[in-house]
Amino acid sequence: MKRRVFLKHTLVGALTSLAAGPVVGLGAGVETPPPINLQRLFDTSDPEVAKLAEAIFRQCVLGKLSAPRGALKRTWITAGGGFVGQWIWDTMFVVDLLSLLPDMEQNIRDVFQNYWDFQVRWNQQRPAYAHDMVSCMIEPQNETKWLEYPAYSQIPILAWGVERVYRRNGDKELVRQCLGPLERFHEWYWRERDVTNNGLVAVGAYSGDIQHGRFETFDYECNLDGLKLTVHPTRKGEKEGAWYGDICAAGNTAYLIMGERSLVYLAEATGDKSLAARRQRRIDKAVDAMRQHMWDEEAGTFLSVNRDSLKQVPVATIGSWIALMAGVPTTAMARRMAEALRTESWQTPLPVPTVDRKDKRWKSDAYWRGDVWPAPNYQIATGLVRYGYQDLAADIADKTVANAMKNGVSEHYDAVTGKALGVNFLGMSCTIATMMLDGLTNKYRLKLREIPK
C-alpha cells in the first residue's frame, strides 16, 4: 500500500491536543478534509520534534487555509499575522507541506487558480507588455484598487511550488492547469525584468515606487540600497514610466532559473518536449550570465550587478546563496561557497544572516539586514546538499530547528541571540518542518509514517 493511501485510511480522528487551539484559517467554502490526527502523522523518536511538527502543521499549514472572500474567489492561503492575502513565495512553502496530507488536491488547485484568475483580470486592463504578471500578493479586501497596488510581482517560485506538489501527490491535473500560465508568467519576468536581454533579472514596479521594486525580492536587502527606477531602455511611448530597476538581483535571477528548471521537469512529466526545450534555453543563458557577471571569487558567492554597466554591487546578501539551490555554480564555485559559509561572516550563533556580518549595515535583528529567516535557511541547506555538503547543510538546519524549539516558531530571528522576531507561526516558517522531512538535519529526525511491509 502506498504511503498516501495509508495516510488517508489511518489519519482520521480527533485532532491531537498537543497542537493546541483551533485551525483558525478554515471556513465555509474550503473543501474540508477528514480530521487529521497529527500525532499519528509523524514518525520520530523525539517527543519534542513531534510536538514542534504538530504545531507547525496545525498553525503554519492547516491554519493558513482560508475560505473564499472578496477578491479571492477560491480557497486561498493567507500568510499569517497582519499579512492578510495570498503571497507568491510564502504560499509555495505551505502548499508543499499541504500536499502531504490526504484529500487536499482540490484545495491546492484552487490556491493556484487564484494566481491565474488574477492574470486574466490584469491582462484585460493592462497593455500587452505588462501581460501575465502575477502580483506579489492578492488581498481579499482589495477589490477596487488591485490594478494600482500591488503593481509589482515577487520572487518567482510558483513553478517550484507546483513541482513540489506534483512530486508529493502526483496530481497531473494540477500540472495541466498550471503549465500555460506558468510559462506566460516566466516570459513576463524575462520581458519586463531583463530589459537589456542579458539573462539577468532586475526588480521593478509599475507604480514607480522604489520600495515597491524592492518588495519583489527580500524587502530591505542591502544590495538594493542604491536602487533607481528608470524608463525602459528601448521601448518608447507617451504612457511609459520609470518602472524598471537598475540593479539585477542575484537572488531573483537564481529563483527564476530554479523556476525554469521546475517548468522543464513538469513539461517533461506531461510529454511536452517543446515547452521543456524553450525553458532550457532560458536556463542556459541565465546560468552563463550569472557565472560570468555575478560570481565573485573573493566573496565566495554571487553578487548583484548594475543592469547597464554589469558592475558588481559590493555586498553579499541572503540572495547571493540561492544560486546553490538553483544549480547555478560550477563544482569549484560551490566549493568556494561552502568555504565562505563557514567563515565568521556567515557563522553567526544562529546562521545564516541576511547580510555579511562584516558589512557595516549588519545588525543581528534587522529586517533582511542581518537577521535570520527559516525559509532561506531551508533553501541554502537544500542547495548545499545538492553539491554534496551535507554536514554544512545539517549544521544550518539543526541550529534552525533547535532555535525554534527554544524560542518558538516565528517569522524571523535575531542572528546572535536567536530571539523570535515578527509574526508567530508565519506560514512560510513551516520550512522548519520541511528541513526535517527533507532529511536536511542530522540531530532532529522526522518522517511521515509508512505502512509496515
Task: For each feature predicted by the language model, list its residue ranges.
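Heptad-repeat amphipathic alpha-helical coiled-coil interaction surface used
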Residues: 159, 166, 257, 263-264, ...
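N-terminal export signals
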Residues: 5-28
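Extended, well-ordered alpha-helical scaffold segments
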Residues: 45-56, 103-117, 171-190, 270-291, ...
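C-terminal segment of N-terminal export signals and the immediately downstream linker at the start
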Residues: 1, 22-44
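Extended glycan-interaction surfaces of carbohydrate-active proteins
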Residues: 36-86, 110-148, 198-248, 288-372, ...
